[in-house]
Amino acid sequence: MTAGRGDEDSLAAGGPARHIPVLRDEILELAAPQADGLYLDATFGAGGYSRGLLATQGARVLAIDRDPGAIAAGAGLIAESNGRLTLVEARFSDLAAVAERLGLGAFDAALFDIGVSSMQLDEAARGFSFRFDGPLDMRMQQSGPSAADIVNDADEEALADILYYFGEERASRRIAKAIVMDRAKAPFRSTAALAAMIARVCPGKPGDIHPATRSFQALRIAVNDELGELVAGLAGAEARLKPGGRLAVVTFHSLEDRIVKLFFAGRSGRGEAPSRRLPGEPIPPPPTFAVSGRQPVTPSAAEIAANPRARSAKLRHGVRTSAPARAPGRDLMALAALPQRAAKGR
């Protein structure tokens, strides 16, 4: 999608949304679009990757995005594509069902660009950003609980867990306690009010990221179940890729990258136990992906200079084998969900 995926301080460095796809050349080189190929752009956004794929005459693209605004903005590219682009409002977890409903065959490549986009962050009314005053919303689709619902209704322990596990916020307990105390006087309704409270409780040092960065990331991930959707999307792509098809995933923070890294390690056999096994020990399933080359791929110095918002991007990729797809393991599901009990000592 666009250049603005990642932590919001990286996004602020780039200014207003410029709709520049991150690692575009590397992604398209991996996808290697062909005239008779079918490709998945799982995060349409401003259409940067889809446009690159469609530049190959005869290539067809299924693009999905859970943001209705992105779908509406894609009407022009649909018209330009002469029927080669199908754009659907859907989540990652809907991917396989959408492809099945449309009667599509297996994909030659599947491309993911994970996280919130610069367009979403730069629109104050969406409530994603601490840089603008807007409603405390953060929903990519206008359904389900908002960030305000979580902040005003969740108990202190649940809030601390969300901030700690989804934002890697060390001051999670302090911030959660302050939220509960302040909301007793008046509920939080705006991004500015929440950001100001966090800055008051955890004032940063000059040169540090904004004190609210990690908390806003955590709330956004919780509101949209971003990590659970990522796991579902990886599994859906595995099920719909043809042998030899490529899966390429760009992430912008450590939680996402950890899931993608673990997925490829487990699916390629790199995460399995040594070849010598005890009698009766189960044989691991055959690899569903082949992974090669130095990974992750990161933006060049020239790309970062031209587009500072790209600086935290990491690209991991693999080639689909003919082995049957399988359900995500418990290790992946555990990374995508909050632990049942809060971690102690934080």
UniProtKB/Swiss-Prot annotation:
Primary site of residence: cytoplasm
Annotated compartments: Cytoplasm
UniProt keyword annotations, A-Z: Cytoplasm, Methyltransferase, rRNA processing, S-adenosyl-L-methionine, Transferase
Chain intervals with Basic and acidic residues compositional bias: 270-279
Keyword rRNA processing in annotation: yes
Domain of life according to the entry: Bacteria
Enzyme Commission designation: 2.1.1.199
Residue numbers binding S-adenosyl-L-methionine: G47, G48, Y49, D65, F92, D113, Q120
Annotated stretches, region: Disordered: 270-346
InterPro entries with a match to the protein in the record: RsmH (IPR002903), SAM-dep_MeTrfase_MraW_recog (IPR023397), SAM-dependent_MTases_sf (IPR029063)
One GO biological process term: rRNA base methylation
Reactions mediated catalytically: cytidine(1402) in 16S rRNA + S-adenosyl-L-methionine = N(4)-methylcytidine(1402) in 16S rRNA + S-adenosyl-L-homocysteine + H(+)
Listed GO CC annotations: cytoplasm
GO terms for MF: rRNA (cytosine-N4-)-methyltransferase activity
Presence of keyword Nucleus: no
Family matches, as Pfam families: Methyltransf_5
Role, per record: Specifically methylates the N4 position of cytidine in position 1402 (C1402) of 16S rRNA.
Family: Belongs to the methyltransferase superfamily. RsmH family.
UniProt-recorded name of the protein: Ribosomal RNA small subunit methyltransferase H
